[in-house]
From Swiss-Prot:
One of its GO terms (cellular component) is cytoplasm. Its main location: cytoplasm. GO terms for biological process: carbohydrate metabolic process; quorum sensing. The keyword Transmembrane helix does not apply. It catalyses: (S)-4,5-dihydroxypentane-2,3-dione + ATP = (2S)-2-hydroxy-3,4-dioxopentyl phosphate + ADP + H(+). It comes from the Bacteria. This is Autoinducer-2 kinase. The lineage of its organism: Bacteria, Pseudomonadati, Pseudomonadota, Gammaproteobacteria, Enterobacterales. Keywords: Cytoplasm, Kinase, Transferase. Its EC number is 2.7.1.189. Catalyzes the phosphorylation of autoinducer-2 (AI-2) to phospho-AI-2, which subsequently inactivates the transcriptional regulator LsrR and leads to the transcription of the lsr operon. Phosphorylates the ring-open form of (S)-4,5-dihydroxypentane-2,3-dione (DPD), which is the precursor to all AI-2 signaling molecules, at the C5 position. The keyword Glycosyltransferase does not apply. It comes from Enterobacter sp. (strain 638). Transmembrane segments: none annotated.
Length: 530
């Protein structure tokens, strides 16, 4: 029997996942990794190339052993990763520096680049690439030019972290549009580099590697890589891509107008656009899909999953113990409790992530507003439900922004990731958005999408998009409760007004933003003196 291997480099861990050709997950090898903070470099988060390659190889060995497979059973390999993380190589093709997606050292360089063309440069970058400077590769390259000229001068090629893994396996350097698109240096419309953007930024444009579409063959596993990874020499290595876009492929979200909410540490609201375009208000990010010729509007809710974990760990020690004794997940127990709280959570309004404003991206200080001192109305179950409702409200706000600039009218959405495990959360998302919600069976949608790319490149599948639609299986479906629509519409309007006031407190220096984009310059709002 034939099998496919996906190597998935996430923010906090690396996974090697083996699938059969029917999309069934056979085994997984996983290892956590940590990124390196450089002394005296605030916001730095370097990617440990040597250690992380060893961990990736370890995961491949684990996956093969757990599946009881030989290397010859793996017909093809592809790699995917977190977006925004970049790797630089010297003229010999050896990696010399890398940073993770969360590296925020270049705040000053972001501000410096924004001043170009009388403060129009960021808009020019966005119009071409769908990206702003905050997460772009250009400020990081400029930081290296300023602070590590030895690395900058020696850099001959740039790729993404997924491409680094593929290069370690095959010896071939290239990027794909879905991941490289997040550098802010790739043309969203042509799906190729735009060297003029680097020229305008005063950066070298001779470091841009070849662009190959997801699902095309890059090379084959080398003898050296085979000895380290346990894979068979000569196994095809196929172009992978960005984690979110490949996740959409694994969910069958491959047609124009289709919509997904991916619920993890961050929540992404993703919409396949009928035509490639950007948002005139610069609120929404636009990325190349792994489907050739297609772009995705992507909005992001910050720390949604992390907020739930904080609430569980900070306030629900008793529930964690009870859940452990009952042999169930603590979140499932908290959902049971929250299910007894009426819709609207007695008016409690969580203030955590704002809706996405890509050009001016920051959030209020975390808080709960409108608490009651009645313990029957305001307790852990109430706050947990309020957090779930708020995550759905932020998602609905983000989807509304996408609809306004794209003209897409949503018919349904796919809900996947850790958040989708909760039946209550899935129902709340349906009620708040007014859309039918489908939850897939697959637990590793990104890895499955990556495996589909691997199989397509090896000739085992004829078409990536058609295969994604064929292999996805649905676990549950939820329909909106019309009785809750008016309530949630009113809650959304109130929350938006309250959140705007909370941002005013941040602007005045009275509270601290939960997160703000690197290089953001805010003008404090005038407030009356006491």
């Amino acid at each position: 029997m034939s099998y496919l291997l996906a190597l998935d480099a996430g923010t906090g861990s690396v996974r090697a996942v083996i699938f059969d050709l029917h999309g069934n997950q056979i085994s997984v090898g996983q290892a956590e990794w940590k990124h390196l903070s450089v002394e005296n470099v605030p916001g730095s988060m370097e990617f440990d190339l040597d250690t992380n390659w060893r961990l990736a190889c370890q995961c491949i060995h684990q996956a093969l052993e757990r599946a009881h497979l030989n290397a010859a059973d793996i017909q093809s390999v592809a790699c995917c990763s977190m977006r925004e993380g970049i790797v630089l190589y010297d003229r010999n093709g050896d990696a010399i520096w890398a940073c993770a997606n969360v590296d925020a050292r270049a705040s000053r360089e972001v501000a410096e680049l924004k001043e170009i063309h009388d403060y129009r440069f960021e808009s020019e970058v966005y119009d071409v690439s769908g990206q702003t400077l905050a997460l772009s590769a250009m400020p990081r390259l400029l930081w290296l030019a300023h602070h590590r000229p030895d690395i900058y001068r020696n850099a001959a090629t740039i790729t993404m972290i997924s491409d680094w893994l593929a290069a370690k396996l095959s010896g071939e350097l290239a990027v794909d549009p879905s991941n490289a698109g997040t550098t802010g240096m790739l043309d969203l419309f042509s799906r190729d580099w735009r060297p003029a953007l680097l020229d305008m930024a005063g950066l070298r444009a001779d470091i841009l590697s070849p662009v190959k579409e997801t699902g095309t063959v890059l090379g084959a596993v080398t003898k050296a890589a085979a000895s380290q990874s346990g894979l068979r020499e000569g196994t095809p290595v196929v172009m992978g891509g960005g984690d979110v876009q490949l996740g959409c492929l694994g969910l069958g979200v491959v047609r124009a107008g289709q919509t997904a909410v991916l619920g993890g540490t961050f929540w992404q609201q993703v919409v396949n656009l009928p035509q490639v375009r950007t948002d005139p208000d610069m609120n929404i990010r636009v990325n190349p899909h792994v489907i050739p010729g297609m772009a995705q509007a992507e909005s992001i809710s910050f720390f949604t999953g992390l907020t739930m974990r904080w609430f569980r760990d900070a306030f629900c020690a008793e529930e964690k113990l009870i859940a452990e004794r009952m042999g169930m997940d603590a979140y499932a127990l908290l959902e049971e409790m929250a299910n007894r709280v009426p819709a609207g959570s007695h008016g409690v309004m969580p203030i955590f992530s704002d809706a996405m404003h890509f050009k001016q991206w920051y959030h209020a200080a975390p808080s709960f507003i409108n608490l009651s001192i009645d313990p029957e109305k305001c307790n852990k179950a109430t706050l947990f439900r309020a957090l779930e409702e708020n995550a759905a409200i932020v998602s609905a706000c983000n989807l509304a922004q996408i609809s306004r600039f794209s003209g897409v009218t949503f018919e349904s959405l796919v809900f996947a990731g850790g958040g989708a495990k909760g039946a209550l959360w899935s129902q709340i998302l349906s009620d708040v958005t007014g859309l039918p919600v489908r939850v897939p069976e697959v637990k590793e949608a990104t890895a499955l999408g990556c495996a589909i790319a691997a199989g397509t490149g090896a000739g085992l599948y004829n078409d990536m998009a058609a295969t994604g639609e064929k292999l996805v299986k649905w676990s549950r479906e939820f329909t909106p409760n019309p009785e809750h629509r008016e309530l949630y519409d009113g809650m959304m309007q109130k929350w938006q007004a309250v959140y705007a006031d909370q941002l005013g407190l941040v602007d005045s220096g009275l509270t601290t933003s939960m997160w703000q984009a690197p290089g953001l310059v805010r003008v404090p709002s005038p407030r009356p003196s006491p």
